Amino acid sequence: SVVHVVWHDPIWISGNGTFQNEVIAMAGGINAFGSVNEWGIVSLEEFIATDPDFILVSSGTGMTEEGRDIIQDYFLSEPRMQGVKAVQNSHVYVIDTDIISRGGPRIVDALEEVATILHPDIFGANASDTTPVAQSPGFGGILPVCALLTGILLGLRR
């Protein structure tokens, strides 16, 4: 089972009816909190009892100056979480918030990343290699789009 965590205090998760739930399902996973409608808060006890195999956290929602994600740090260092399968197996992953927390064309990138995390044997990649450590500013695609549009406009003028 897989859980997408938006925040850790309180534990805010993506449930049924969210595009994160759809990404998890399309990647071959089962949302550990599929019984929760939309986004919701679950107690620490509920989270521990659910015992997910994978924990996905969004980057950028809690980055330290050193580039660490405080949500991921919470799950890895919280003593009460040490019995959770995802923590025991080091399956707590940071995913770029620009691809997992915003519905749009880049959701395909989230699907690819989640599928790689859940099925590294199929995709031939080490899931920990796909985990970003820096916060994405979200402006990386502007320059190529402008260049493409300029090329199209110049082509039309001829």
Give the predicted meaning of each segment.
Residues 126-158:
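Secretory targeting signatures
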Residues 116-120:
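Internal hydrophobic alpha-helix adjacent to the cofactor/substrate pocket in enzyme cavities
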Residues 46, 114, 156-158:
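A generic membrane alpha-helix/interface feature
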